[in-house]
């Protein structure tokens, strides 16, 4: 277990916080890619301007 002085205000160690951040960013990139593909598909199907 991490010592109290090693924990940030979130209760995570620096290593855990970096791992959580990398997982979060991977999910954000995946969500963004799916959203872009969906918008392009809808625009090709029915342009909105």
Swiss-Prot record:
Transmembrane domains' residue ranges: 28-45
One term under GO cellular component: plasma membrane
GO MF assignments: bacteriochlorophyll binding; electron transporter, transferring electrons within the cyclic electron transport pathway of photosynthesis activity; metal ion binding
Biological process, per Gene Ontology: photosynthesis, light reaction
Binding locations of a bacteriochlorophyll: 21, 39
Membrane topology: Single-pass type II membrane protein
Keywords on record: Antenna complex, Bacteriochlorophyll, Cell inner membrane, Cell membrane, Chlorophyll, Chromophore, Light-harvesting polypeptide, Magnesium, Membrane, Metal-binding, Signal-anchor, Transmembrane, Transmembrane helix
Compartmental location: Cell inner membrane
Gene3D superfamilies referenced in this protein's UniProt entry, alphabetically: 1.20.5.250
Stretches of the chain found on the membrane's Cytoplasmic side: 2-27
Membrane-side (Periplasmic) residue stretches: 46-49
Described function: Antenna complexes are light-harvesting systems, which transfer the excitation energy to the reaction centers.
Quaternary data: The core complex is formed by different alpha and beta chains, binding bacteriochlorophyll molecules, and arranged most probably in tetrameric structures disposed around the reaction center. The non-pigmented gamma chains may constitute additional components.
Membership in a protein family: Belongs to the antenna complex beta subunit family.
Name of the protein this chain belongs to: Light-harvesting protein B-875 beta chain
